[in-house]
Design a protein with these regions (language model features):
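N-terminal presequence-like segments and the immediate start of the first folded domain
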Residues: 1-70, 74-88, 93-142
Length: 142
């Protein structure tokens, strides 16, 4: 088997990692912060020029969750799978008091409660650039 790097148009930040790797029928998705292309571009530019990291923009938490989950879906789809084939998800929230809002949106990305993956959710001491959350996942290709 050969490791395959999955590209799906999800904004990359020039960090020393791939966002998604497929190995055989397994999919590994790195922690995804809610970075849209505009912010990711500013981050790449700052890193390339050795400048300070730009502050994370003031984006409503609901929008941050949708950015992360949309990017996860894009990566899963590009790997030849679907959200219902995720096996394990790890969620870091900046503020645990936002768990209900997160859960409401998160559930909408799966076809039923039976297809929800195993999951760990915790409050992070600090998230990337102080954004509201980061989510990583492991899944399979049916």
């Amino acid at each position: 088997m050969k490791k395959q790097v999955i590209k799906a148009g999800v904004p990359e930040t020039s960090g020393p990692f791939n966002l998604c790797v497929r190995y055989g029928d397994m999919i590994y998705i790195s922690g995804l912060p809610p970075f849209d292309e505009e912010y990711a571009s500013k981050l790449r530019d700052a890193r390339a020029k050795g400048q300070p990291i730009p502050p994370f923009p003031d984006i409503p938490f609901e929008r941050q969750v949708r950015i992360v989950m949309d990017h996860m879906k894009m990566l899963v789809d590009a790997a030849g799978s679907n959200m219902d084939c995720l096996l394990k998800v790890i969620v870091w929230l900046k503020d645990q008091r936002q768990q209900e809002e997160f859960d409401r949106i998160y559930r909408s990305y799966f076809s039923s409660t039976e297809t929800l993956p195993a999951r760990t959710r915790m409050q992070a001491g600090r998230t990337p650039m102080d954004c509201g959350l980061e989510v990583e996942a492991i899944g399979y290709v049916p």
